[in-house]
Amino acid sequence: MVKNFFHIRRLKKILAKIKSFEKEMSSLSDLDLQKKTDEFKKRLADGENLDQLLPEAYAVVREVDKRILGLFPYDVQVMGAIVLHEGNIAEMATGEGKTLTATMPLYLNALSGQGAMLVTPNSYLALRDAKEMGPVYRFLGLTIETAVRADESKPLETKEKRRIYQADIIYTTNSALGFDYLIENLAENKKNQFLREFNYVIIDEIDSILLDSAQTPLIISGAPRVQSNFYDMMNTLVQTLYEDEDYCYDDEKNEVWLTQKGIRAAESFLGLNHLFSKENQELVRHLNLALRAHMVYKKDQDYVVRQSENEAEVVLLDRATGRLMELTRLQGGQHQAIEAKEHVKLTQETRAMASITYQNLFKLFRKLSGMTGTGKVVESEFLETYSMSVVKIPTNCPVIRRDYPDQIYQTLPEKVFASLDEVKHYHAKGNPLLIFTGSVEMSEIYSSLLLREGIAHNLLNANNVAREAQMIAESGQLGAVTVATSMAGRGTDIKLGPGVADLGGLVVIGTERMENHRIDLQIRGRSGRQGDPGISKFFISLEDDLLKKWGPDWIKNFYRDYSPEDFKNNPILLKQRRFKKLVSKAQKASEGNAKLSRRLTLEYAQSMKIQRELTYAERNRLLEDTNEMEEEINRVIEYVIKQVAYEQSFENRADFYRFILHHFSNRAERIPQEFDIHSPKEVSHLLQAIAEQELLAKKSYLKSDKLYSQFQRLAILKAIDENWVEQVDYLQQLKSALSGFHTSNKKPIVEYYQEAYDGFEYMKERMKHQIVKNLLMSELALNPKGEVVMYFP
């Protein structure tokens, strides 16, 4: 808090400078205010920097916000805006106006002409905020675009994306930006690229995107794999095994492994002598996937089974938000293993073509900043990973919400019935109620109980998100009852209806503590915005997932068989001190493990990051470089020929001839009888002659040097892309194989780095051979329009 005090004191000095321009700006005409943008751009060109422009620029935006929106940013919002410009995180409580705060740093950083972005967790918020704030930027002469559509089933065209990403200010989502970055780097020519260099970004709900979503990399999938028939077999095998006897599960690390007894049981089931021999690698991989499907991935917590008209499908859930992740599939066969577990039709397993984590995506920006209501508790991780401080901004009005102590019960039914009594009590008074649950299953249980009590309510979970923002916005009305999972409606203001403040405000009921304290704070923060009254209370049982997974062993002594009806009328509250500390200790253990997992994800992603940057840099060089490539191509051909001549052996002339037909030319003449296939010198001479002949034929056919250069680039590009896709897919498979299954005494991450490096070196070798094959074995033809069409092998 001492550090935050000095931050605030420094911010107030800058705030005073901004306020000193207030009278001047209010006296300007609209036209004079609009002219300020060109003035600022000229001052930048003359040598001033953004920090020097900040006081006056913020004063301009503040005045325009007032004239266009009728909203004059509070002092605390201006302080938050200063933090955002400095590349740090502004912690601002729910309802403090983060959307308006962002107008100031977005305008200032867009003045450089290099672009500024605001990234939100979902398209609804991006579209809403851009629509509401857009008039401010347009008034000031800046262009604003949204890189998402309301209908996500209709993707944006490349031409449209290029126009969008050239805008001064862009509102988008983290997933849309990530996929656009990956698509950009799969483009075959400059015409299909649309991004410019990443400059400045504000991430809304930054902790949700950079921390809670850190475990899920963005992946573009491509060509389907040959479908394995092992999924159902391994699902059946796992169902015959017993936990602790045949396999062990570490729920803290989410790791599962077979015991010696389990290995023997698997060998017996599969009719094998040695399960872990090299030829059984695929079986072991599928067994690992099946074990993880049953032990690590929980229905209605990690995924839901959604029924459509004809068939069911597995859709992943975001644990932090409770939202469906429609476009995301687990890689490496894990998704198919879960489908086998749930007995739904297996989807096609696809290859990963490109992948990036959110951490590495946002590190591509020159300057990164963010907003959240709950960043201070994880400031150390933001400092360590992103070198960003978290500054807690004071609220504009004092928070008068009443946060009651946790109500702890022994059993789950006691907790449910006690919380239901609380709901009935406040509902009878007319207070609006927002009831948060930790899973889809629990939200539906509460919904059923409320219906049984005759209490009308809205249910908001992953199975019902169409009206999410509207439901949350209306949840502050008199008598409203809303049941929601985790952090539904984050970013949507809840305004109290008439008469609600007199009753004590919105009542938030948490039906369990979540796996990190930030989500609990966010749940509480739904009530008591902008000085409104409010009430929050959590109900906990010793049987909650958090305590079962992270609590001490002694709480198991309190578990016993019972009938839920036993506790309906007389729930017993646990008041001893040791129970009070139980939850915070369990949360700290959970948060510590989550932090380690994120660090491990970053470590695994490091190999991919280095390899991706090297590969993309080479692709971009090819797309942008206009110089002749003859020397470079000749070096590659010479290298490949030398390798074939000196390192590859052929049984006879027919074997060597087959090699030539497959790799150098399908028009080559037969090998002369006197040719010595064991002479590297003769092999080199022959292959060099064939290569020169093929290249000369293609150059003659194309006639134009420009077309020939285009052909050369495309041949190299195809080789890079095909081999990079193989490498990305290999790294995904490798991580899946090493990260969750104990088969070796080595540290999995060390083994991964070594294998990943070896794989990359092998990829570069394959790539050179593929370049030669593409250059020599491709077919050229004219289409009916007279255009040259290139067919690569």
From Swiss-Prot:
PROSITE patterns: SECA_MOTOR_DEAD (PS51196). Disruption phenotype: Loss of export of cell wall protein GspB; glycosylated GspB accumulates in the cytoplasm. It is found in: Cell membrane; Cytoplasm. InterPro entries: Helicase_ATP-bd, Helicase_C-like, P-loop_NTPase, SecA, SecA2, SecA_DEAD, SecA_motor_DEAD, SecA_preprotein_X-link_dom. The keyword RNA-binding does not apply. It catalyses: ATP + H2O + cellular proteinSide 1 = ADP + phosphate + cellular proteinSide 2. It is a peripheral membrane protein. Pfam families: P-loop_SecA (PF21090), SecA_DEAD (PF07517), SecA_PP_bind (PF01043), SecA_SW (PF07516). The keyword Endoplasmic reticulum does not apply. ATP binds at Q77, G95, E96, G97, K98, T99, D493. Its main location: membrane. One of its GO terms (cellular component) is cytosol. Its EC number is 7.4.2.8. GO terms for biological process: intracellular protein transmembrane transport; protein import; protein targeting; protein transport by the Sec complex. Keywords: ATP-binding, Cell membrane, Cytoplasm, Membrane, Nucleotide-binding, Protein transport, Translocase, Translocation, Transport. It is an enzyme of class 7 (translocase). GO terms for molecular function: ATP binding; protein-exporting ATPase activity. Part of the accessory SecA2/SecY2 system specifically required to export GspB, a serine-rich repeat cell wall protein encoded upstream in the same operon. Belongs to the SecA family. Monomer and homodimer (Potential). Part of the accessory SecA2/SecY2 protein translocation apparatus required to export cell wall protein GspB. This is Protein translocase subunit SecA 2.
